[in-house]
Amino acid sequence: TLSYQRDLLKMADYLEENGITDCGKVTKTALNSYILFLEKEGKAASTISRFLASAKSFFGWMFREGKIRRDPADSIHAPKIEKKVPVILTVDEVTRLLEQPSGANPKEIRDKAMLELLYATGIRVTELVGLKLSDVNMSIGFITCRDEHKERMIPFGHAAREALAKYLEAARETFLKGTHSELLFTNYSGREMSRQGFWKMLKGYADEAGIQRDITP
């Protein structure tokens, strides 16, 4: 059908722009990246579902015909974007809070990245402190959160990407002190931050920003 052809042509254009011109080299990650691209463009869920049906049909046929060695669309699902928790702060208060870590030292660079990422994605604090380096895709701009039942791919914007890039380049090694860690964020001992530790940090910046109300992460 025309819709089927149009879906595949748009996908092919996106993949080609990202250096993938051979169907045999298309991966599940590449298809998930395209789905995130469609979501960022504001495409309706029905449009993304139709693309998935087209992709599954096309790659399933290619696999059955022996034209590709594996079907990248076989187990793919549309990533669910987590709804952000209701914001209890005003826009002005959020702006002031995010401005508090000025980035004058490694701790403030790390804290800035954590606050920006938390605000951009709406994930839970336990998910934030448990993120691994491999959960972050800087080139496309999304994080992957997992639990026992599902995997969520959540996009983030320019401000969070900029803060993360600065942290990874200029501050993360300071906390690791020459050791290795899969964690994205660590404390000064190179270990996972506790939820209480993050709360204490957040409360400190809220006080500096002159925010009187009792906020919780």
Which stretches of residues belong to each language-model region?
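Conserved catalytic core of the tyrosine transesterase superfamily
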Residues: 1-217
